[in-house]
C-alpha cells in the first residue's frame, strides 16, 4: 500500500509539473493588420490603418492663377480681326482670315465667315463660297486700314509721284516678305467717308502682286492735319511693344507679327515708329483659275474642234446705208452652260466639292459684220472678236465698228459679255446692293461669258 501511495504521489508531482508549463501564463497574440492610407496629407487618410495599401488619394493642386494681361481689349470677336477696332475685316487683307491648310499650294485657305461681311440694309450676309475656295487673297486686292484720326497724306507718294514711295523715310511700305523687295505705290484717303466713320487710308499698287507670295504692309510716323501724331490701335501697340492681351486671336498671331517686324526692321523701319502693320498671302495661280480652267476644259471637250452649231435669225445686206458694210448677220450659237439660269441674278451649279457642273447646251446671240471691201475685192478677211463697255452689248459693238472694219478689211464678230452687259445685269447689280452675295454670281456670269466666247470662236472658225 505504502509503495502504491508513493507511486501515486510521484505521478501527481510529474503531472503538476507538466501542467505548470502549460498554464503558467497567457501566450501574446499577433496584432490584427489594418490596411489603409497612412499619409495624413491624403484625402482618404485612415488613422486606424496599420499597414499602407498604397491607396492614398491626394487633392488636385490649385491651378496657378493666370497672369493679368498687360492690355484688355474692348473690341474682340470670334469672327473679326481684332487688330483694328473700327471694322471687322480691317486691316485688309486681314491675316486673321487665313487658315492653315496643308492641302493647298500656299499652305493656307481663305475663310471669311458671313458674320464678318458687312450686312446690307435688307438682310444679313452669308459667307462667299467663291472666296472661301481659294488659298489666299487676290493679287489684285485693295490694301487699306483706318486710324482714330485721318492722316495727312499730302507729303506721301501720290499717283504723280509714285517713285517717292521707295524713299527710305516714306510713311508707308509694301514689302514682298519672300524676296525683301519694296513695291512702288501711292497713298490716298477715301474722299467719300462720312463724319461719323473712320476714314480708309489706301495703298495703291501699280501692278498686280505676285501669286502665292507673302506681303507686309507698314504705316509709320503718321500725323493728322493738325500735326499731331496718330496712335496705333491698342491691339497693334500690344503686338508692337510686346504687351500681352486678353485676346486669344491676337496672341495666336504674335509669332507671325514678330516675323513681320523683323522684316520691316531689315528694310530700315524702326519698330517703335509703326502705327499699323500687317501681313497677308496671295492665292496661287491654280487656285485663282480653278473654276474657269475646269469650265474651259469641260466645254472644249463638249464642243470639239468645230463647235456644235449656229442658227441665223437675220441677214441685212448693205447695213447702215454708208457703203461700209456688205452684210450684217445675227443669230445664235450653241454653248455649254454652267449657270442655273440665263437671267441674272443666277448662280452657277456646283458639285459637292464646289467644282462648276455642266447643265445643258443653250443658245447665245451673236452678231457678224462683213465689210464692203471684202466683197468688192473678192477676198476673205481675218475675224476680230469684239468685247464691249460697261452695260453694253455685242451687237452695238459690231454694228458700231463698220468704218474700222472696212478700213482694215476685218470681219467683226461679237456676243454679250454677261455680267457687265445690257442683258439684265444692271438690275442684277442693283440687287447686289441689297444682297452682296449677288456680286459673286455676277463673277460667275463672267466665267460663263468666257465659255460663250470660246464656243463662238470654235463654231465660226469651224464653218
Residues of each region from the PLM?
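Short regulatory "switch" loops immediately downstream of catalytic or recognition motifs
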Residues: 1, 24, 150-156, 338-341, ...
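Secretory targeting signatures
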Residues: 1-32
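Extracellular calcium-associated, cysteine-rich motifs in secreted modular proteins
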Residues: 26-67
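Acidic, low-complexity Ser/Thr/Gly/Pro-rich repeat segments typical of extracellular/periplasmic
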Residues: 67-344
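A conserved hydrophobic secondary-structure block that centers on an alpha-helix together
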Residues: 193-220, 224-225, 359-401
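Cap/lid segment of the alpha/beta-hydrolase catalytic domain
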Residues: 341-364, 376-463
